[in-house]
């Protein structure tokens, strides 16, 4: 019975507890807000899903955080959850089963994350899910069972991913699908049954993919035509002839496959192995692939993964946990700075973990927990500054531990105790502090001599650089004299090092010394997040703080005692800003912009003793200003604007001993009467605060004023502490709504309440968005319409996280900076209507996730490809009502932003500089006279003028001589007393007021013999008649003298009174007998013969069968009979023809002989080709002659022998012959002539015993005589022509110094060996050798590569986009036959074009005349072009070498520094230097007939890289000095 009673009691207690649990409200997760069944945790920077989410939650908002991983326990038990928001996180991994408990889930948003893949059967338990958003991730493939179980999905969004593969049947379960978006992916093919089972599909997007329209995609065309309202703008991207065609418009016969292809379902290899990696034998190799994160699609059976030499920074939670069989992980040489504590959880088989060469500073707690099999752990070359005492507690089998080259100063005792199997340890290159806390390590290393790297002490000085294992343990001591690095904190930090409390890292931009953290003078506007916990003094003075926010930062600083906020711009302190700062006893807020003081500002400062509020803008001290500051002893309010102090203002300051109220404009009226008596009683005030009002009490100490004189008579009843002053005088206020419309305001009025929610500033004269607006965090509406705002900044609306409505319409906005609207995640309405905006940069609205209405009409939008994103953005949820229209370019004018197809937004040529200048006004070069242009938020742009000029555009000289009014080198002098007066002293040869007149020196000249005088500058020149010469034309010429005789072709020169005449030889005419008279003009050739001119005669070339001097004899009549060719056998494809009754063979290129039986010329087109001549052909005395043609610089021509050899090759365009008869080094000779010009050259080689003779084109021979020893040349070896085999026994040439060993590339013909013409058909021939010679000359193929051919001489392999025999015709050029009348054709794509009209013409075909005013018509630029400034003003942009308003002045000779690649042609390849070369270009003019040119240059060697993959080193001549020198014709 007793047992039954206890059972009943236990059952009753269980029921009671269950009921209490059901009734009691569940706790809300920390930082989140809960209302009913809704839990809101958005925008909290969470890195993981919070714990303890109430089980009854129906809606969970986790968007806008930093979550990286979803585990299968995160949402366990949430069986009532219907809506889950996970967008805008950093999720890269979702464990299988993560959503298995979410049986009621209806909507799931995972868009804007980092997902690359997701596991199959992920949604198996979510049968009620009807909306799933996976857009804007990095998903690469869709597995076959991706959506298995989620049969009720109606809306599935997969757009803007990287999907390239969809496994067959992936969508088979989604029979009720209504909306499917697959646009903007990398899809190339889809299986035929992909969408057939979706009868309810009403929205389907597939555009912006890489669809390949071959026979396997023909089904999609029919499918789309049957459903004309879905799949709009779906286009082919291949093959090339269908690129850009709508799939639905392509006919079935056009979907063709090349060859016999059979469709194979897309093989989604990326699902089983990362795209950048290789997978085999359970090993995944991702070394050096540029990865930035751990791949998620790894095979579950892997045993080893290699991730070294990438740029991975973070190891997320559970990164390797799914791969239970892992034995080795290599993460070395990355940039890892963050490791999740459970990154390696569950890897019980892991025996090697390599983490060296990263940026790890701390090992998280439990990082190596459960790694019982680990034997090798490499942590060297990191920045580890602390080891927890239990860091290695489970590593019982570890053999080798490397902590070499880190930042360890101490190690807690017991850290290495669990390492029972340790054999080797590396601790060197750490800054160890060898005090008493490290004594244990010395004892440990004495007992276990396993440290092999030589770990040494860094401090104290007496132990510096000594090996820890060799120091006696008694030397490790702590004393008051030995405090290192941070005085007073060493011992404290060392003791806690086992818990990694010694947070040594100093915040970025700050300086840490002792317990002081100095972050002053760094332009900070927020308190750094990671401040060391040992901080006692925090210096934040001289920064850019405007509001002190309640971030809870001081809760983490238990040692903090002093904070310095002086010299900032602080206007407000949020309630709770100092929460947790209970130990702080001194705060400096001197020189800020505080206007009032409230007790909530200082909440949490229970121990504060000193409060400095000097030099602020405080106007009132209320009786609640200092509540809670009972410990304050010193309070300074010096130099503020205090006029009133409320009675009892200092009563709560029980410990106050010093109060400074000096330098304040106190109004001694009735409201201040109490203060005089209080000052007399307390006697704690520094100095004597004085009255400033009323006038009769000015400068009277307050404590000396009689009580009856503190009156509010004569209207002096101002009270700065009155609550009525909470509304500016220019505005009207109702609750939290402030209206300041149409008040002519230029700055924000003072006194706007901090809790204002709606602020109306429309109809004023603001030119900028007031910076002070960022202080009003509760604003939900701002109206700044109808002002003069011309620019916005990236900080214009910072801190306005609650803003719902922003109206900026009817201003002068020209540019939207990319980050102007960052942080406005609650904004629902944005009005930019009626401005001058042309372009909105992509990403400008990224944070406007809640925006439902955008007004951007009445703006001159320039709708090219840079605005396509905005069109897509407004179309996505119809956020723009269809008012905004495009103003250009071209055909886009007047098109609606909302309805115009995205493909119409294209870029066609350069954008007008006036449009670009809206966001960068300096592009239009508005600053004249070398002024420097800078953007300015108020004046749009501002010019910094050089000396001598002023004005907005630096176009106004400060005095008359600045603009050099004296021409032609005249000297300008100012007239005293006249601002614009000047006079000129002219250079010789000029006169006039501005030296503009060149004196006519021909008025008194000495030119003789009727010569013509030509005026110069201070001189003149005589132009002589033909028969005279000399400076003054005083000498008569003898034209018939031998050195002057102009008569050509042996004609006779005869002197005449007027000069000379030529008596021509027969056949020549002309003044100088230089013209060969065309005797064919009156020829007697008959029967269609061709006349060929000759000197003093002509020749008739007769048609076939005709003969005679004038081809007058007809061919004899031939009776039908058998052709002579019938029995004449032409060889090698030659054609037999009959000529004069005789059969003749017309040989193909390369062949000759009576029957074309010999192959005598060949073309080497392969770098590995060669001919092999039998050894019997070559004897000790041999004469070899051949003809070659090439434009290459190098290549083997002839080679015979093994180690001792005769070799003839091309070397830098010359013929190089070497003869190695056994002496070393081998002798060599070079031809004087270069032969790589593409023409044929004769090379003759004569070998006689131990001498070798070389001759080119019949020139003087070069001879080698090598008599050092008897020749060992092997005459039994063959003779190789044009190359040689790459075997070791004939590789001496390839290895010889100065020789390249590459095969010949070009033509060889008429090879004679000992006067015997060689037939190449009879010798072994490699592939890549063609009969006939037609060498490829440079640039014969305009846009392609020349390849020799035996049939046509050569063929051109054209580049993409070009066609024709010489690659000089464009393919699919829509501009061929265009109809542009007064304009230029610009191709849009392969099928259409647009016309860019000339000035004064318009219309689609530029066939309409326009009468447009062009400001550039008013000025003429002599040596330059007219441009428009940012304000629309015309100016001249001068060509190089000229200056002046009209570009009419030539700049004197000077060298202009340029830095660019140096280019040259090398054979068939274009080559350029591997780096840019700095050199001078000489520009400008010179006087005295000289030219501007180089005076000094130098030669330097540079490396060149060529388009064919080759490289070489060559010299380049660089100009280093320019000046005036003799002109070179």
Curated annotation (Swiss-Prot):
GO biological process: aortic valve morphogenesis; apoptotic process involved in luteolysis; axon extension involved in axon guidance; axon guidance; branching morphogenesis of an epithelial tube; cell migration involved in sprouting angiogenesis; cellular response to heparin; cellular response to hormone stimulus
Boundaries of every LRRCT domain copy: 209-259, 430-480, 664-714, 859-909
Positions of the record's site feature: Cleavage: 1121-1122
LRR repeats: 56-77, 80-101, 104-125, 128-149, 152-173, 176-197, 301-322, 325-346, 349-370, 373-394, 397-418, 534-555, 559-580, 583-604, 607-628, 631-652, 755-777, 778-799, 802-823, 826-847
Assigned keywords, A-Z: Chemotaxis, Developmental protein, Differentiation, Disulfide bond, EGF-like domain, Glycoprotein, Heparin-binding, Leucine-rich repeat, Neurogenesis, Repeat, Secreted, Signal
Tissue: Fetal lung and kidney, and adult spinal cord. Weak expression in adult adrenal gland, thyroid, trachea and other tissues examined.
Positions of disulphide bridges: 277-286, 434-457, 436-478, 506-512, 510-519, 668-691, 670-712, 727-733, 731-740, 863-886, 865-907, 922-933, 927-943, 945-954, 961-972, 966-984, 986-995, 1002-1013, 1007-1022, 1024-1033, 1040-1053, 1047-1062, 1064-1073, 1080-1091, 1085-1100, 1102-1111, 1125-1136, 1130-1145, 1147-1156, 1307-1333, 1336-1346, 1341-1356, 1358-1367, 1375-1385, 1380-1395, 1397-1406, 1416-1426, 1421-1436, 1438-1447, 1453-1492, 1471-1506, 1482-1522, 1486-1524
Pfam families attached to this UniProt entry: EGF (PF00008), hEGF (PF12661), Laminin_G_1 (PF00054), LRR_1 (PF00560), LRR_8 (PF13855), LRRCT (PF01463), LRRNT (PF01462)
Domain (Laminin G-like): residue spans on this chain: 1160-1333
Domain LRRNT intervals: 31-55, 264-300, 497-533, 718-754
Molecular functions per Gene Ontology: calcium ion binding; GTPase inhibitor activity; heparin binding; identical protein binding; laminin-1 binding; protein homodimerization activity; proteoglycan binding; Roundabout binding
Signal peptide interval: 1-30
PROSITE patterns from the UniProt entry: ASX_HYDROXYL, CTCK_1, CTCK_2, EGF_1, EGF_2, EGF_3, EGF_CA, LAM_G_DOMAIN
Gene3D superfamilies reported for this sequence: 2.60.120.200, Laminin, Ribonuclease Inhibitor
Domain CTCK: from-to ranges: 1453-1528
Primary location: secreted
Subcellular location: Secreted
Glycosylation sites: 66, 186, 564, 623, 794, 799, 1009-1010, 1019, 1183, 1266, 1300
Function: Thought to act as molecular guidance cue in cellular migration, and function appears to be mediated by interaction with roundabout homolog receptors. During neural development involved in axonal navigation at the ventral midline of the neural tube and projection of axons to different regions. SLIT1 and SLIT2 seem to be essential for midline guidance in the forebrain by acting as repulsive signal preventing inappropriate midline crossing by axons projecting from the olfactory bulb.
Domain comment quoted from the record: The leucine-rich repeat domain is sufficient for guiding both axon projection and neuronal migration, in vitro.
Name of the molecule in the record: Slit homolog 2 protein
Organism field: Homo sapiens
């Amino acid at each position: 019975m007793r047992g039954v009673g206890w059972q009943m009691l236990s059952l009753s207690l269980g029921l009671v507890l269950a009921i209490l649990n059901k009734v009691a409200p569940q706790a809300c997760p920390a930082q989140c807000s809960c209302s009913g069944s809704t839990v809101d945790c958005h925008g909290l920077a969470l890195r993981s899903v919070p714990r303890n989410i109430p089980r009854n939650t129906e809606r969970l908002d986790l968007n806008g955080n930093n979550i990286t991983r979803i585990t299968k326990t995160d949402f366990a038990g949430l069986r009532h959850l219907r809506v889950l928001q996970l967008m805008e996180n950093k999720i890269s991994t979702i464990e299988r089963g993560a959503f298995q408990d979410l049986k009621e889930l209806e909507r799931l948003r995972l868009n804007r994350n980092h997902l690359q893949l997701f596991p199959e059967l992920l949604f198996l338990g979510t049968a009620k899910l009807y909306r799933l958003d996976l857009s804007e991730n990095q998903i690469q493939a869709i597995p076959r069972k991706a959506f298995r179980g989620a049969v009720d999905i109606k809306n599935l969004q997969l757009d803007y991913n990287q999907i390239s593969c969809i496994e067959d049947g992936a969508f088979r379960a989604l029979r009720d699908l209504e909306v499917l978006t697959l646009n903007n992916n990398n899809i190339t093919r889809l299986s035929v049954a992909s969408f057939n089972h979706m009868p309810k599909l009403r929205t389907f997007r597939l555009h912006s993919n890489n669809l390949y329209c071959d026979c396997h995609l023909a089904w999609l065309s029919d499918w789309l035509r049957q459903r004309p309202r879905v799949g709009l703008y779906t286009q082919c991207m291949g093959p090339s002839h269908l690129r850009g065609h709508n799939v639905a418009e392509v006919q079935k016969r056009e979907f063709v496959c090349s060859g016999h292809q059979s469709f194979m379902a897309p093989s989604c290899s990326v699902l089983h192995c990362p795209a950048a990696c290789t997978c085999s034998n359970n090993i995944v190799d991702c070394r050096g692939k540029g990865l930035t994160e751990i791949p998620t699609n790894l095979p579950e059976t892997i045993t080893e993964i290699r991730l070294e030499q990438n740029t991975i920074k973070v190891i997320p939670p559970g990164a390797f946990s799914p791969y239970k069989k892992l034995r080795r992980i290599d993460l070395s040489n990355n940039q890892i700075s963050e490791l999740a504590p459970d990154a390696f959880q569950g890897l019980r088989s892991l025996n090697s973990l390599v983490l060296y060469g990263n940026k790890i500073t701390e090992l998280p707690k439990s990082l190596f927990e459960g790694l019982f099999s680990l034997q090798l752990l490499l942590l060297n070359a990191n920045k580890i500054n602390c080891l927890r005492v239990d860091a290695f507690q489970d590593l019982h089998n570890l053999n080798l531990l490397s902590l070499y080259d880190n930042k360890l100063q101490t190690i807690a005792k017991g850290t290495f105790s669990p390492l029972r199997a340790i054999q080797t340890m590396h601790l060197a290159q750490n800054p160890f502090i060898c005090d008493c806390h490290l004594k244990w390590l010395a004892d440990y290393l004495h007992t276990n001599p396993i440290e092999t790297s030589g770990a040494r002490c860094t401090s104290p000085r007496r132990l510096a650089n000594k090996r820890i294992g060799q120091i006696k343990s008694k030397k490790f001591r702590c004393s008051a004299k030995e405090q290192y690095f941070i005085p007073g904190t060493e011992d404290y930090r060392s003791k806690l090092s086992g818990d990694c409390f010694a947070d040594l890292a100093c915040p970025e931009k700050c300086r840490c010394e002792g317990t002081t953290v100095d972050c002053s003078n760094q332009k900070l506007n927020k308190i750094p997040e990671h401040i060391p916990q040992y901080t006692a003094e925090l210096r934040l003075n001289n920064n850019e703080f405007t509001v002190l926010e309640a971030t809870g930062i001081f809760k983490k600083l238990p040692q903090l005692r002093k904070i310095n906020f002086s010299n900032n711009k602080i206007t407000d302190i949020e309630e709770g800003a100092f929460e947790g700062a209970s130990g702080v006893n001194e705060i400096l807020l001197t020189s800020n912009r505080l206007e009032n003081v409230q007790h909530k500002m200082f909440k949490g400062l229970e121990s504060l003793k000193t409060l400095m509020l000097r030099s602020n803008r405080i106007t009132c001290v209320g009786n609640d200003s200092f509540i809670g500051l009972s410990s304050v002893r010193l309070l300074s309010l010096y130099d503020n604007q205090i006029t009133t102090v409320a009675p009892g203002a200092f009563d709560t300051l029980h410990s106050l001993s010093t109060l400074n109220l000096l330098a304040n404009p106190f109004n001694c009226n009735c409201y201040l009467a109490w203060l005089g008596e209080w000052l007399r009683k307390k006697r704690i005030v520094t100095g004597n605060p004085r009255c400033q009002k009323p006038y009769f009490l000015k400068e009277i100490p307050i404590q000396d004023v009689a009580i009856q004189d503190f009156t509010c008579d004569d209207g002096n009843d101002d009270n700065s502490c009155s609550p009525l002053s909470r509304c500016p005088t220019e505005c009207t206020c109702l609750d939290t709504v402030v209206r300041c419309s149409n008040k002519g305001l230029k700055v924000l009025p003072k006194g706007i309440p901090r809790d204002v929610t709606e602020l109306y500033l429309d109809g004023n004269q603001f030119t900028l968005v007031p910076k002070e607006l960022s202080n009003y965090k509760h604003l939900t509406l701002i109206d700044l319409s109808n002002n003069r705002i011309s620019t916005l900044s990236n900080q214009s609306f910072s801190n306005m996280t609650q803003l719902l409505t922003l109206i900026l319409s009817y201003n002068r906005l020209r540019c939207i900076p990319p980050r102007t609207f960052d942080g406005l995640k609650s904004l629902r309405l944005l009005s930019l209507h009626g401005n001058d905006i042309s372009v909105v940069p992509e990403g400008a609205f990224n944070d406007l996730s809640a925006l439902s209405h955008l007004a951007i009409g009445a703006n001159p939008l320039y709708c090219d490809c840079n605005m396509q994103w905005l069109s897509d953005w407004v179309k996505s949820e119809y956020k723009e009502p269809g008012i905004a229209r495009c103003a250009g370019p071209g055909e886009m004018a007047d098109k609606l932003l909302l309805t115009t197809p995205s493909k119409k937004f294209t870029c066609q040529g350069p954008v007008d500089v006036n449009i670009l200048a809206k966001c960068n006004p300096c592009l239009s070069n508005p600053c004249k006279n070398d002024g420097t242009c800078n953007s300015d938020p108020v004046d749009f742009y501002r010019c910094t003028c050089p000396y001598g000029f002023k004005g907005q555009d630096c176009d106004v000289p400060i005095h008359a001589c600045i603009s050099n009014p004296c021409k032609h080198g005249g000297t300008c002098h100012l007239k005293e007393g006249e601002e614009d007066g000047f006079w000129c002293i002219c250079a010789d040869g000029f006169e006039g007021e501005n030296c503009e007149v060149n004196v006519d020196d021909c008025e008194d000249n000495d030119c003789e013999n009727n010569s013509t005088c030509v005026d110069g500058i201070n001189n003149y020149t005589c132009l002589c008649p033909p028969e005279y010469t000399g400076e003054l034309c005083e000498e008569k010429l003898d034209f018939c003298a031998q050195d002057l005789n102009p008569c050509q072709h042996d004609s006779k020169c005869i002197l005449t009174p007027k000069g000379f005449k030529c008596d021509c030889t027969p056949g020549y005419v002309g003044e100088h007998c230089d013209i060969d008279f065309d005797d064919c003009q009156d020829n007697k050739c008959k029967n269609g013969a061709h006349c060929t001119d000759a000197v003093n005669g002509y020749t008739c070339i007769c048609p076939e069968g005709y003969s005679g001097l004038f081809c007058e004899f007809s061919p004899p009549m031939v009776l039908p009979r058998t052709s002579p060719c019938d029995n004449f056998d032409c060889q090698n494809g030659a054609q037999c023809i009959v000529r004069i009754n005789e059969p003749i063979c017309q040989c193909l290129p390369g062949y000759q002989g009576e029957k074309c039986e010999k192959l005598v010329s060949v073309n080497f087109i392969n770098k590995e080709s060669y001919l092999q001549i039998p050894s019997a052909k070559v004897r000790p005395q041999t004469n070899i002659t051949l003809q070659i043609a090439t434009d290459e610089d190098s290549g083997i021509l002839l080679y015979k022998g093994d180690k001792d050899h005769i070799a003839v090759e091309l070397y830098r365009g010359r013929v190089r012959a070497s003869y190695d008869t056994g002496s070393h080094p081998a002798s060599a000779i070079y031809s004087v002539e270069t032969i790589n010009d593409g023409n044929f050259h004769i090379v003759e080689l004569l070998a006689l015993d131990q001498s070798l003779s070389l001759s080119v084109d019949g020139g003087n021979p070069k001879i080698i005589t090598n008599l050092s020893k008897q020749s060992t040349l092997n005459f039994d070896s063959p003779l190789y022509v044009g190359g040689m085999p790459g075997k070791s026994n004939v590789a001496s040439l390839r290895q010889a110094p100065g020789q390249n060993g590459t095969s010949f590339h070009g033509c060889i013909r008429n090879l004679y060996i000992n006067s015997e013409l060689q037939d190449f058909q009879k010798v072994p021939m490699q592939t890549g050798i063609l009969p006939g010679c037609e060498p490829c000359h440079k640039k014969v193929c305009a846009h392609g590569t020349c390849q020799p051919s035996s049939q046509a001489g050569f063929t051109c392999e054209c580049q993409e986009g070009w066609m024709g025999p010489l690659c000089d015709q464009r393919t699919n050029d829509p501009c061929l036959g265009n109809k542009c009348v007064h304009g230029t054709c610009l191709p849009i794509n392969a099928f259409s074009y647009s016309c860019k009209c000339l000035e004064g013409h318009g219309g689609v075909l530029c066939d309409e005349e326009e009468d447009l005013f062009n400001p550039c018509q008013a000025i003429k630029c002599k040596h330059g072009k007219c441009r428009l400034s940012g304000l629309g003003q015309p100016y001249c942009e001068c060509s190089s070498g000229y200056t002046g308003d009209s570009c009419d002045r030539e700049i004197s000779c000077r060298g202009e520094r340029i830095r660019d690649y140096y280019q040259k042609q090398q054979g068939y390849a274009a080559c350029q230097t591997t780096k840019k070369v700095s050199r001078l270009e000489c520009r400008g003019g010179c006087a005295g007939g000289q030219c501007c040119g180089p005076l000094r240059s130098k030669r330097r060697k540079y490396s060149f890289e060529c388009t064919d993959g080759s490289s070489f080193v060559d010299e380049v001549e660089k100009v280093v000095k320019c000046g005036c020198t003799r002109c070179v014709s």
